[in-house]
Amino acid sequence: MVPYEYYVVLSGLLMVLGLIGIIIRKNLIAMLLSTELMLNAVNIAFVAFDMKLYDVSGQVFVFFILTIAAAEAAVGLGLIMAIYRLRKDVDVNTLTELKL
């Protein structure tokens, strides 16, 4: 059995990769995917601590986070599609105006 510390390290690495993806990327779709990666890192951390503490509450939180991530992805992709229809671009640097 793999020690839980490895899962915590993996979770931290995924969180850092997601944060780097949000900071470096300027495409809205890549930023949304980086956010999903960060949410999955939190899920891995919850399961790792759940494995260490022999408690099932971490798994319950994982299901809540998965449902929130699915709703966030649906709303985010809908907004990105609406922005693309109006501007023909999803680059963050070009989305500086509030007016159409």
Swiss-Prot record:
Keyword Cell membrane part of the UniProt annotation: yes
Taxonomic superkingdom: Bacteria
EC number assigned by the record: 7.1.1.-
Primary localization: membrane
Subcellular location: Cell inner membrane
Mode of membrane association: Multi-pass membrane protein
Catalytic activity from the UniProt record: a quinone + NADH + 5 H(+)(in) = a quinol + NAD(+) + 4 H(+)(out)
Keywords noted in UniProt: Cell inner membrane, Cell membrane, Membrane, NAD, Quinone, Translocase, Transmembrane, Transmembrane helix, Transport, Ubiquinone
Pfam family, one: Oxidored_q2
Record-linked InterPro entries: NADH_UbQ_OxRdtase_chain4L/K, NUOK/Mnh_C1-like
Record text on subunit structure and interactions: NDH-1 is composed of 14 different subunits. Subunits NuoA, H, J, K, L, M, N constitute the membrane sector of the complex.
Described function: NDH-1 shuttles electrons from NADH, via FMN and iron-sulfur (Fe-S) centers, to quinones in the respiratory chain. The immediate electron acceptor for the enzyme in this species is believed to be ubiquinone. Couples the redox reaction to proton translocation (for every two electrons transferred, four hydrogen ions are translocated across the cytoplasmic membrane), and thus conserves the redox energy in a proton gradient.
Protein name: NADH-quinone oxidoreductase subunit K
Originating species: Persephonella marina (strain DSM 14350 / EX-H1)
Organism lineage string: Bacteria, Pseudomonadati, Aquificota, Aquificia, Aquificales
